[in-house]
């Protein structure tokens, strides 16, 4: 992650998966309330989506792991350089380990929805584990760095740790849509904050560099972090409104088609009686 693209990659991953989790939670909730939405509310569809989600998470994790190891100048799976007598790019191994635990989450997703004997709640436990590992890694990621660098990573640790707590609560309290949406909003915040860290530490396109020892920059980024979270709340709200409208409009079309079929059946019955 020693450049802007290295922060944009996990930022994109987390933002996409956060938006998907938000959409899935809202869709499940609306479909339970509107039971006539037919196939949209079927367990078979959601099980297939969970398996597809697991495959996607595994693919994202493998992409991140390969990127950390095999980029030019990367560690190339060598943890210790015996010739030089020191550890080899441990920060890259930090990121590799983070991706690895999210890969385990994807594997758990696939197994829990293909093997009926496994508890579905295992996925929430694996998500909580992955997030706690990520928080632990980034907490110990910035020793000896500049003040602003440490601060933006501390904010990242805060949101990751809170997301892990929410995921663990979901493990204990199942099918709570508010907890699911809170977790989704925090994952979205994590994704957008990765981008913000990239802009601060590695300004793209030759932009002006941030003074990493300026206290006013810390004051601004404190406000900026709150703005990021406000945007994620707006995204969740807009997503909820859109999915509600989409499901209800589909329900209206189904109802109108059912009414039309009933009218046609009545007309056919009346014509048969007349004959």
UniProtKB/Swiss-Prot annotation:
TM segment ranges: 7-27, 51-71, 100-120, 150-170, 218-238
GO cellular component: membrane
Localization: Membrane
One Pfam family this sequence matches: DUF716
Membrane topology according to the record: Multi-pass membrane protein
Domain of life: Eukaryota
Family: Belongs to the TMEM45 family.
Identification of the protein by name: Transmembrane protein 45A
